[in-house]
Amino acid sequence: MANVADTKLYDILGVPPGASENELKKAYRKLAKEYHPDKNPNAGDKFKEISFAYEVLSNPEKRELYDRYGEQGLREGSGGGGGMDDIFSHIFGGGLFSFMGNQSRSRNGRRRGEDMMHPLKVSLEDLYNGKTTKLQLSKNVLCSACSGQGGKSGAVQKCSACRGRGVRIMIRQLAPGMVQQMQSVCSDCNGEGEVINEKDRCKKCEGKKVIKEVKILEVHVDKGMKHGQRITFTGEADQAPGVEPGDIVLLLQEKEHEVFQRDGNDLHMTYKIGLVEALCGFQFTFKHLDGRQIVVKYPPGKVIEPGCVRVVRGEGMPQYRNPFEKGDLYIKFDVQFPENNWINPDKLSELEDLLPSRPEVPNIIGDTEEVELQEFDSTRGSGGGQRREAYNDSSDEESSSHHGPGVQCAHQ
C-alpha cells in the first residue's frame, strides 16, 4: 500500500492509494453512472464529491500534492475554481476557497464588503499647510424600517433553488464519463439566497434590505502627506445584511503647481535672471506655500552659471507626522542672455575690457577653410540625410565614432 498523507479522496472512489489511472477511471465511471443526477436526483452532493475526487486524482500534479501533503497540499497548491469550495467542505469539513468569489472575510469570520475608493484632489498648499475639508458621499445602509430583513418578520424564506447559497452548481457532460462543473448566480434569488413574497416586502426599501443615504465625512489632510497616499475611514463603505462593511479609502491626487515641483520632502523651482544679475549679484522675492514672502540674495562677484542649482536649507516640505522638520528648496537658475546686436558695436571693446581675457588663439599653419555658424532649428532636422547614408554604409566600428549633428550649443 502506498504511503500517502490522506486517503479520503481514494475512499470516495473506493480504490487503494496506489490505484492506476485505468483503475481510477473505471471506478469513477461506475460511481458517476450510479449517482448521476439524471438517474438519482437526491444524490447531487455525492456526485459532486465523486467528480471532485476524480478531478484531483486523475491530475498527476494535484495527485502528487494530495499524496504528499493531504488536504493542506490542495489548499496551498490549487488556484481555486467555481464550486470547489462547496465540494471541499463536504469532504474535509472546511472551505478551500471563499465561496462568494473575491469577498474577503473579517477577523470574526463574517464576509467583508468591498472597499470604496475615491480620488481626492489636493493642492501643494494643502499638503504643505494641512487642511480639513468635508466630503459628501452616497452609500447603502441597512433599511431602518425592516432592520435589513427586506420584509416583515417571517416573510423571508430561503431560496429553494440554490438552498440559500446564492449560487447554483451546474453539471455539463463533456464526453461519456467526463463532466464539467460550473457555478453561476442563482436566477431565482439574484444571488441573495433568500426570497420574499411581493406582498410581504418592506415598503421603504422595496425588499432590497438597504437604502441610499448621504454621508458627510470630515477629512483631515495632514502636513507633509504625499501624492498617492491614502486616508481610510474604516467600516464606512456600503452596508449589507450579514456582511461587515468595507472601508472608504480616499486617494490623494496632488494638483500641478505653477511654481514648485515636489520631490519627496524637497521642493524645486526655476527662476530666470539676466546676464547682469548672473555676473553682478541679485536679489528677488517669491511667495512660499504658506504665504510668506521669501527674500533671496546673492552677493556681487559670485557668478551664477546657466542651469546651475542653489539650495535653501529647511524651506522644503514638512515631514509627515514630524512637521517641524522640513526638506530643502532647490532653485535652478535660467540665465537670460541679451538679444543679438543689443549693444552698439563701438561699446563692445569697452565691455570686453571688463570681462576676463580671451584665450590665446593658436597660430594657423597650412591651408584652412573658413565656415559659417548658422542657427539650428531642431524641428526641421539637420538636412544631412543623404550625407548620413554614406556613413551608414561604413563599418560598425567607424559609425560608432561619428556623433550625430543634433547637439546644440548652449548660448553663453
Swiss-Prot record:
InterPro entries: DnaJ, DnaJ_C, DnaJ_domain, DnaJ_domain_CS, DNJA1/2-like, HSP40/DnaJ_pept-bd, HSP_DnaJ_Cys-rich_dom, HSP_DnaJ_Cys-rich_dom_sf
Record-listed N6-acetyllysine modification sites: K39, K152
Zinc finger (CR-type) residue numbers: 130-214
Lipid attachment, kind S-farnesyl cysteine: C409
Domain of life: Eukaryota
CXXCXGXG motif repeat feature ranges: 143-150, 159-166, 186-193, 202-209
Residues with PTM Phosphotyrosine: Y391
A single GO BP: response to heat
Positions carrying Cysteine methyl ester: C409
Functional summary from the UniProt entry: Co-chaperone of Hsc70. Stimulates ATP hydrolysis and the folding of unfolded proteins mediated by HSPA1A/B (in vitro).
Name of the protein in its database record: DnaJ homolog subfamily A member 2
Species, as recorded: Bos taurus (Bovine)
Lineage: Eukaryota, Metazoa, Chordata, Craniata, Vertebrata
